[in-house]
Structures are given as structure tokens and as C-alpha cells.
Amino acid sequence: MTVVASALHRRSMALASGVTPAGWRQHRRRLEQMAPHRESAVPSRRRPLTAPDCDPPTAEEVRALADFISRSERLLVITGAGVSTESSVPDYRSPRGSYSTGFKPMTHQDFMRADENRRRYWARSFVGWKRFAERTRPNPAHDALAALQREGHVWRLITQNVDRLHHAAGSENVLELHGTTHEVICLACGDVSSRRRMQKTLERLNPGLIDAAEALASAPIRLPADESDDSDESDDATASNVSAAQRPDGDAEIDARRAASFEVPPCASCGGGPLKPKVVFFGDSVPAPVVADATAASEGADAVFVVGSSVSTFSAFRLVRDAAARGAPVAVLTAGETRADPLATLKVERLAGETLPRVLEAVRREQMWGY
């Protein structure tokens, strides 16, 4: 549809709904007068501790992103940890992330190397899961992306996050590049089961840690960077030798002696194991079917929108690189530098949760009124 045809179509829709030509022109003038100040119309909210410091987006930045989205017919959105930091889920690489304290996540090699490593992983996951599963909710970034998808502006959505907050917000056909903490896989037989069911089994086998999990679930969320601070923790969590610091994948630090005695069940399907969260650990490989699906999305996209990601992992970066090599424009919305910056035709360094709702409004205005 040409620009002229689109404008005529929007005007005919307005007339059909009872808006007179004079009223239509008056509405356009009113919106034009409001446009420079429009961004403040989106309700503000308290910024979580896990989100980096960042100024709100300007009207020009919002319009540029809205134009980028509106011009695309097959927009591929790739999201990362920066989307979920505004849901109080910390990341690894930001100044406030887990790496800032020297924390090292469990690698695939460590997980497979020894039974005691797997016990430690599952003990930490057990204690932290209740808070992660019950208190973590989608934020306005997730909601805006889901709305953009429903309204036909997002062709494919690939996320590097393992929290399933896109699903909770209503996004469909989400490709989880690095898997999800909400499922458990048996490395012997391949059976996939629910993480919630696993939690119930772990509770039955380890009743002595239930109180610690409950205490941590009710404790104020703290950053990994606050570990050495004297800020208050839940007395119950401290007494249980459990750190109240939130970790990126929903786990928590516990005393090594308690982890050593933690009981992990065998696979309910084959009786063997080991059981592992269906997550691509550091040092692991993305499953071939996921690689194929992601590659097809990159090849079919006419534009790529990176949101809340530094795309530092090659599994995500190659999708952007290959699409850009075929001529697809790239927009980046994230607070900080990214590996894709040299490829970007548009870069906006803002928080996704404070920017995308405004972009959604701008896209809707553009669809209805042509600007």
C-alpha cells in the first residue's frame, strides 16, 4: 500500500467512525502540538534496583524507533537480559550484574564433571526458585512487545532470556535461544518435565531447606553487588546460611555443607539421569533445531530490532550479523555498548521498559494518523 493510499485509508476509517473532515484536521493539529511532550504521558513507575541508571527516551528517539518498526514487514526482535532487569532479574555483565562480585555461573563442563557440583546447583536452584517463580513478573517492555506482536508489527521474537516473561506477557511463538529454567531435561533419556514438579519432589526429599526457601521468597530483593554491604537481610534467610542476593537464573547462595547433603532425584521416566534445567549453560551448545529455527528467522527478516542485549554471545550476534550482511537494517535499544553497534543503523541507549510503551503509542499514532 502506498503512502497516499494509506493516508486515504486512515481518513476513510475516521470518517466511517463519525469523525468529520474538520474534526479529523483538528485532531491532527492537537496531536502535533502534543508530540514534543508526548513521552511524559506514559505513566512513570519506580525503577528496580537491577536496572541500570539511564535517562528517559527523547521524543526524537521514540519516533525514530517507531518509524523503524513501521517500515518493516518481517521484523525480527532479539531480546536479552536488559529486558528482564526491569523485572528485578539481574544480569551478568552490567556494572550491577553478578560478574561485578566475581560470581561465576555453573558451566556445562562443571555440571557434568561431578555429582557434588550437580547437588550444589540444584540446592541453590531449589532455595531461589520460589522467589524467582512467584515474584518475577513481566514489565512494560514485555507488555509492549506482546502488543506489537498482536498488532502485526513483530514477525518473530527470539529471546536469550530463560525466565519466560515474554510468555507471561502474552507473546506467542517465542524462540528461546538459550532454553528455559521452567523445564527440566534428563540427559540420559531426553525426557522433559516441569520445573514446578521438580520443586515439589525436591521439597519432599529436602524438607530441611523448605524454611530457607520460604524465607528467601519473602526477603527484599538485593543485588549481587550488595553482597558485602551491611544492608538488612531476612533474619530467617541469614540463619539458614542463605544469601538474599538475587541471581540471574533464579538461584541463591547457600552454605556448602547444606549443598553437599542435598538430595537430587533420578529421572521419573527412566530412573537414571542426571537431571538438568533445560538451559544452555556457559560452555554448552545451542541445540541444532533451535539453531536452525533462529537461522531461518534471521534469513527471513527484513529488519532486526535488538532489545536489552549486548549480543556478546555468538549464538545471538551471528543472527544480527548475517541479517545485516543481507542488507537488513538493524536497530538497537539497550543501555550500554553492544557487539552489534557497528552494524546498527539506529542506536538508542535507553531502558526498554521506559521506552517501548512510548514506541508502541507512537506506532499506533502513525498507523492511525500517518505520523
Regions found by a protein language model. Give the residues of each.
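Conserved catalytic core of sirtuin-type NAD+-dependent deacylases
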Residues: 2-371
